[in-house]
From Swiss-Prot:
Its EC number is 1.3.3.4. Pathway: Porphyrin-containing compound metabolism; protoporphyrin-IX biosynthesis; protoporphyrin-IX from protoporphyrinogen-IX: step 1/1. It comes from Dictyostelium discoideum (Social amoeba). The gene is ppox. This is Protoporphyrinogen oxidase. Pfam families: Amino_oxidase.
């Protein structure tokens, strides 16, 4: 019987694991876990992991500007439905705001300037396709040869995102549109990123024919296969009908959301307050785990922290990056240590810029959607630029009286721009201006960001506020064969630890916040605790 649980990490994965442990995995749970003792360990002095929101005073004393130093928004699609349900259960759904329609535009930097990718008008799509020489790629795609391993659905088959889409769509379309998408999500090197771990659905559906035109003419077999895929993916997900009142807020139908007061940190703050009011849960800040070993007498796990304290747990859940978990098994399990070290990560720098009284900047970015992504072929040091004040105007028009009237003029001369630099070091093989952010000073990174905005957007003004955050090994990089590696890790754990040790976080299956919360739900469900 599980009586004492340890959780390593207090990012959204660790905090959501705590929540599901204490409250059950669904809305109808009447969880009686009052006897379950939970300890949460965090090596830093604050919770939240990569979710860190900063509040900056606006141009007036009663205004505040919301700046996201890490992830900037959530999507209410797929696993995002589970996140919306999670937010509803936390009791903070009234704080949700959906993004503005002004951020709907999708842009890519081409020939040194942001170019919009048409999404609505068929004529514009055709015109754009001819201009960028991708029409033939789309027309030929259904007739591309499928490798024998794919036809046979070999479970061990994997290839890079680059090779998959180059084979299906051609090199021009792949390097122009697929690669910047990968940079925006993973900061990844698409020549070594696993197709099965990033575009799993596309990889699984390839044996049935074309991914684009072919999807319009599905065979009965393909339709059934997709139904089975959807059924498996939607397990543990609520239906959209259960969340109608939240989707009614999305008047612009953007599916992108955050929180009006404190950005994404609103979730973190709420979860932290629940932990602080829970007498059977203890949060250890500035405490790292240095060793984990199995107690052969009873199968529990013995944990030692950096202060020499020892703990014993019936259940241990790790939500930290696997390469950070690895050293904890160096003495007790050399095989697991080696396996965990084999998972790769990417470093990225996020540069936040605020312009408080600058109508020119507002004018420059107002028609450029959420921002733009930068293909490596552009040979830029920057991999993406986000116009956060386009996405959430409330973030620059947020005063202490909660007066968010867009007609008061407060937001019209204030802007938030976020610049991303870095990514996986494999990018340097095709981009001479790639920057190793872990070996570059923050001042230099800021200078690169400002010079980029000057060159590309003609923004010469100095920002009123700047912040540079470097996430060293901050994003998992799912290399080719990633899923086989994860399976090997899981098999080793099952054989040697049973279900006493569970792995969560974003190193397994999906790097986003939605993925992390959903993974926590899956883990707690796997424990088969009563009233789940």
């Amino acid at each position: 019987m599980i009586q004492k649980v340890g959780i390593i990490g207090s990012g959204i994965s660790g905090l959501s694991s705590y929540y599901y442990l204490r409250n059950g995995i669904n809305l109808t749970s009447k969880f009686s876990k009052n006897n379950l003792k939970i300890n949460i360990f965090e090596k830093s002095n604050k919770v939240g992991g990569n979710i860190q929101t900063r509040i900056i005073q606006g141009k007036n004393k009663d205004e505040k500007i919301i700046v996201e130093e890490g992830p900037r928004s959530l999507r209410a699609l797929g696993r995002g439905l589970n996140t919306l349900e999670f937010i509803k259960r936390l009791g903070i759904s009234n704080d949700i705001i959906f993004s503005s329609a002004n951020s709907n535009g999708k842009f890519v930097l081409l020939d040194g300037k942001p170019k919009e990718i048409p999404m609505t008008s068929l004529f514009d799509i055709i015109k754009f396709s001819f201009k960028h020489s991708i029409v033939s790629s789309i027309l030929k795609e259904p007739f591309k040869k499928v490798p024998s391993q794919v036809k046979e659905m070999d479970p061990n088959w994997d290839e890079s995102v680059h090779d998959f889409f180059s084979r299906r769509l051609g090199k021009t379309m792949t390097k122009t549109f697929i690669e910047p998408t990968i940079l925006g999500i993973y900061g990844g090197d698409y020549t070594n990123l696993s197709i099965k771990s990033t575009f799993k659905r596309a990889a699984l559906l390839e044996p049935f024919g074309g991914l684009i035109l072919g999807s319009l003419f599905k065979s009965k077999k393909q339709k059934q296969f997709e139904l089975d895929l959807d059924k498996n993916e939607k397990r543990l997900l609520p239906s959209k009908n259960e969340l109608t009142e939240l989707f009614d807020k999305d008047t612009d139908k953007t599916n992108v959301f955050s929180f009006k007061e404190n950005g994404l940190s609103r979730m973190i703050q709420k979860l932290k307050s629940l932990i602080e009011s829970d007498s059977l849960t203890k949060l250890y800040l500035s405490t790292s785990i240095v060793e984990i070993e199995k107690d052969v007498t009873n199968g529990t796990l013995k944990v030692t922290d950096n202060k020499g304290n020892q703990y014993q747990y019936d259940q241990l859940i790790s939500t930290i990056p696997l390469n950070q978990l690895a050293p904890m098994f160096k003495k007790s399990d050399s095989k697991l240590y080696q396996l965990l070290q084999s998972v790769n990560y990417t470093s990225i720098a996020v540069i936040n810029l605020i312009y408080k009284s600058n109508k020119n900047v507002v004018k420059i970015i107002s028609d450029k959607g959420f921002g733009y992504l930068v293909p490596s072929k552009e040979n830029q040091s920057v991999i993406g630029v986000c116009f956060d004040s386009n996405t959430f105007p409330e973030f620059v028009n947020n005063n202490n009286n909660n007066n968010n009237d867009n007609d008061n003029g407060n937001e019209k001369d204030q802007s938030i721009i976020t610049v991303m630099i870095g990514g996986n070091n494999g990018i340097k093989d095709r981009n001479d201006n790639w920057i190793d952010v872990t070996n570059t000073s923050k001042d230099k990174l800021l200078d690169i960001a400002l010079k980029h905005l000057d060159k590309v957007l003609d923004i010469e003004s100095s920002p009123d506020f700047t912040n540079v955050s470097i996430y060293d090994n901050g994003i998992p990089h799912y290399n080719i064969g990633h899923q086989n590696l994860i399976n090997e890790i899981q098999n080793h754990i099952t054989k040697n630890y049973g279900t006493t040790l569970l792995l969560g976080g974003n190193s397994i299956d999906g790097v986003g916040i939605n993925d992390s919360i959903h993974k926590s739900k899956q883990l707690i469900n796997s424990l088969k605790l009563s009233n789940n």
